[in-house]
């Protein structure tokens, strides 16, 4: 059984990247034939970063489920699609509402992940702008 190869060397690197506002990709290579190995490896990188997540893109059916389970996300409310076949949801009953895009492993065009990332970035920028407008209106 091959252990996953994580591109980032430590959870500290993930936390540092997220803390400085960078989009961060955690890529797991290798054959994960046992769910416990996958969950343990994923937990080491994702769980300490949960409060820093501004959005989440999870790919692959079992992989996406593993990511959501590891974070303690058990309910999503479907809000729409980034594009056909790429559902956009928000967490329910989690630490806070978190935008989530899920993608079947081999589904979509070559730039599907970039489209998902751009969608979440636009959503985050829109949310910040709306919050700033509300704050400005409350000051008046």
Spans of features found by a protein language model:
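Active-site catalytic microenvironments in core metabolic enzymes, especially phosphate/sugar-handling
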Residues: 1-140
